[in-house]
Amino acid sequence: MKDFSKIFWSIALILVIIILGVLGLGYYKKVTLKTSNPIVTMEIQNYGTVKIELYPEYAPEAVKNFVTLANNGYYNGVKFHRVVKDFMIQGGDSKGDGTGSPTFADLYKSDDENATYKYTNNKDAKSTDPYNIKGEFIANGYKNNTLNLTEGTVAMARADYTQYSPALAEESYNSAGSQFFIMTTNNHTNLSGNYAGFGKVIEGMEVVHNIENVECKSASTEEGTESSENSNAEVSTPVTDVIITSVSVDTFGVNYGKPKTIEPFNYMQWLYAQYGLNYTE
């Protein structure tokens, strides 16, 4: 009987040691192992591959938005529509001219035109309605994003309504949708804290520089309108389209979820209101 008791307690002790070891190993992994950040693979027609590491620790909503759109195929076939040498290259607009915005259908990959969604403020939205995300940078009161916009940094593009009124700063800050830009130099660090940096090129920076050096023309204000040599329009539209053939993101098994959505600012509605008029689309 004594021998049986000794065997029982020996087995119990061994089991306790094993359990404690497993729990200890799990805790050790939790506190010491870093989850891999998402890695973007971007294929650009006639130019090559660019790989980007995303930083959810700096701009979680921007990362959620980019990962979702990319893996839904939103960026496949879009252009780098704006290229400014010694500054940046900008893309991600489905219209290809800088005026487009993603919709809930793009975010949820839905073909159901009757589907309904909600903005963060709980207002109803249709599948075809556009959305924006909150600007995650210091000027907008978001203190966690300390990423500097140096060479290779990827950031969310946004509108600047303050050119129409200084009172529209918040509307400008929260106007990002799908468009992004990649910095090609360290000479514009004044942008740090004013745009949401959310990633960095880790491979293929030479591809970015090759795109930076493409021949550009002035952007036309209307389809078919010729630009003038004396025009004040920015010379930033590539003469030959620079097409992103595919974008995919490896999240290493992490589900980042969908971003919080904001109803886009309606500039025309605001403008009409300045003159006491009602605007109808």
Question: Residue locations for each model-derived region?
Answer:
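Cross-family detector of peptidyl-prolyl cis-trans isomerase
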Residues: 1-281
